[in-house]
Each structure stands twice: as C-alpha cells, then as structure tokens.
C-alpha cells in the first residue's frame, strides 16, 4: 500500500464521518525549528521542551546552516557536541530526562477514572499489579475469570470486528492517542457495513490475550490497540495487532498483522484508523491475516 492509497482511504473514512481529512504530511517525523545554532547551556531550560530538542551543542561550527538543517530534519540525537571525550552536560541531562520519561510510562498505571470517562468496560488479565506484569508476561496473555464472565455478559457476541484497547508497556500511548484513533476507527468499521463488537479496555494485557478474547466472543477479526515499549524521548507510540479468527491453541505470531509507530510523530492516529479499517475489510474478504494474506 503506497502513500497515495493511504491518503485515499483517509479521505474516504473522514468523509463518511462528515469531517475533512488532514493534509498529507511530507515527513513522518516531528520536526523542530531552530533559527540559529545554540551552544550555551542553561539549568533553567525545560529538558522536555521543543527548545531543548532543537538545541545544538557543536561550538564554533564551520557550517552552522548545515547543522541547523540537520537538526530540523530529525528527532534523533544529532549535533549535541562534545566536551573533550565526554558528552556535553545539556546532552547528558536530556538523555537522562528522556530515559526517565520512558521508564515512567512503563511503570505508571492508567487511572481508573480514565476508562469510566471514556465509557469503556474495563477488565484485566490474570495480572494484579505492574510488578507482576513486567515479570510474568505469560499471565498477561490470559484473562482473569471475572473478565471472562464480564465479556460474555456485556459484549456483543459473534462480531465481524472486535476492537480491544490495552495499556501494554506504555500508558501514555493509550491516554494520548485514544480520542484520535478510536472514534474514526469505529465510525469507519460501521460505515463499511461491518458488525462491530463492544470496545473495551484490558488492564495489564499482552498481545496474545486477543486470541482468548476472539475465542470467547466468536469474533472474526480482533484488533488490539496496545502501548508499545517506549524508546528514548518517545513514550506515546501505539501499535495495532490484527488477527483473523484467533484461537488460543493454534494462533501464532506470524498470523498477526502489525501496524506500529502510531503517534503524532509517526503514523498519525487518524490515518492509522483509516488503514486499519481497510485492513479489517481485506482480512474478512481473504479470511486470513499475517503472512497468510495476499498483497
């Protein structure tokens, strides 16, 4: 699927919702602007700000304009300079700040009020706390007994598509991107004439938990939106794992189709929603997912 096809899908889905599709972006990375190289170091600078990300630490550069253009083109750690054989203080502090931000989003919990505010049914895996989630991934692949009963009682049975949201390894990925991806995704699926299941939130879920969910609800396609393991400076990235007719005993990782890097600096959530709708339709047509799908 090329960029032109993706843009057409986005326009189609947004038009069905009565909204205007966003203008296509030329680049997939978030760029920062910096009028001129800045080499001074300040303790007052917010290390998470755009100014800090645009900071250039190379002193007395031969071609300052080249460094400025390079810094604008990427969010990678370039043009940070050195202090002898060591990183400059500003560069090291930003590295530590980004590491702390990534660690925080793994360890913190999705507030209970968040699910209620979104009107989502909340269930959990066999995990009871974050520490157990990180040390026992096998337990995150299965629903607890109470969750199984809740799904049977409160969710639509035998849907064409079942959408599931889970915190995974990034709380921020869910809370930041939810409002931009779920409404257009649900609207697009319904507009396509598909029977859509009741969306719900799974706390402490791993990817394979979608197999049990699909088996319990009799879903033809299960779409799991889950927080990715964060990288340095990027703690809001979401992934979509879609699978056709999942079964706990037989479904393997090659049966899943993954769309990763969903966030404002990667694949925009609205665009991802349109691509997921098209993917679900093709899965139902081909009755396959993962490596079994034809291009």
Curated annotation (Swiss-Prot):
Statement: the UniProt record of this protein carries the keyword RNA-binding = no
Q: Which reaction does it catalyse?
A: ethanolamine = acetaldehyde + NH4(+)
| Requisite cofactors | adenosylcob(III)alamin
Read off the InterPro entries from this record.
EutC (IPR009246), EutC_C (IPR042251)
GO BP field? amino acid metabolic process; ethanolamine catabolic process
Enumerate the GO terms in the molecular function aspect.
Answer: cobalamin binding; ethanolamine ammonia-lyase activity
Q: Where in the cell is it found?
A: Bacterial microcompartment
Q: Which domain of life is it from?
A: Bacteria
Co-factor binding details: Binds between the large and small subunits.
Provide the binding site for adenosylcob(III)alamin.
207, 228, 258
Q: Does the keyword Lyase apply?
A: yes
Q: What is its EC number?
A: 4.3.1.7
Pathway, per Swiss-Prot/TrEMBL?
Answer: Amine and polyamine degradation; ethanolamine degradation
Write the record's keywords in alphabetical order, separated by commas: Bacterial microcompartment, Cobalamin, Cobalt, Lyase
Primary location:
other
Entry GO terms, CC? ethanolamine ammonia-lyase complex; ethanolamine degradation polyhedral organelle
Q: Quaternary state and partners of this protein?
A: The basic unit is a heterodimer which dimerizes to form tetramers. The heterotetramers trimerize; 6 large subunits form a core ring with 6 small subunits projecting outwards.
Cited function? Catalyzes the deamination of various vicinal amino-alcohols to oxo compounds. Allows this organism to utilize ethanolamine as the sole source of nitrogen and carbon in the presence of external vitamin B12.
Similarity annotation: Belongs to the EutC family.
Q: What is this protein called?
A: Ethanolamine ammonia-lyase small subunit
Q: Which gene encodes it?
A: eutC
């Amino acid at each position: 699927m090329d960029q032109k096809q993706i843009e057409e899908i986005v326009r189609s889905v947004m038009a069905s919702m009565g909204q205007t599709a966003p203008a296509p972006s030329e680049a997939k990375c978030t760029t920062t602007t910096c009028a001129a190289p800045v080499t001074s170091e300040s303790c007052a600078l917010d290390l998470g700000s755009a100014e800090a990300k645009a900071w250039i630490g190379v002193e007395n550069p031969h071609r300052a304009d080249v460094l400025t253009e390079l810094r604008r083109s990427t969010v990678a750690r370039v043009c940070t300079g050195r202090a002898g054989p060591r990183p400059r203080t500003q560069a090291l502090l930003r590295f530590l700040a980004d590491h702390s931000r990534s660690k925080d989003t793994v360890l913190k919990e999705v507030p209970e009020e968040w699910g209620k505010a979104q009107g989502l049914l909340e269930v959990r895996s066999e995990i009871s706390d974050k520490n157990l989630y990180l040390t026992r991934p096998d337990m995150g692949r299965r629903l607890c007994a109470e969750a199984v009963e809740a799904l049977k009682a409160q969710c639509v049975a035998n849907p064409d598509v079942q959408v599931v949201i889970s915190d995974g390894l990034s709380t921020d990925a869910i809370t930041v991107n939810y409002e931009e991806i779920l409404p257009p995704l649900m609207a697009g699926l319904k507009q396509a004439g598909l029977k859509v299941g009741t969306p719900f939130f799974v706390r402490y879920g791993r990817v394979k938990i979608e197999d049990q969910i699909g088996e319990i609800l009799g879903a033809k396609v299960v779409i799991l939106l889950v927080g990715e393991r964060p990288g340095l400076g990027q703690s809001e990235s979401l992934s979509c794992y879609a699978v056709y007719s999942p079964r706990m005993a037989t479904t393997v990782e090659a049966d899943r189709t993954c769309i990763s890097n969903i966030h404002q600096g990667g694949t925009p959530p609205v665009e991802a929603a349109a691509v997921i709708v098209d993917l679900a339709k093709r899965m139902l047509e081909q009755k396959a997912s993962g490596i079994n799908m034809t291009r």
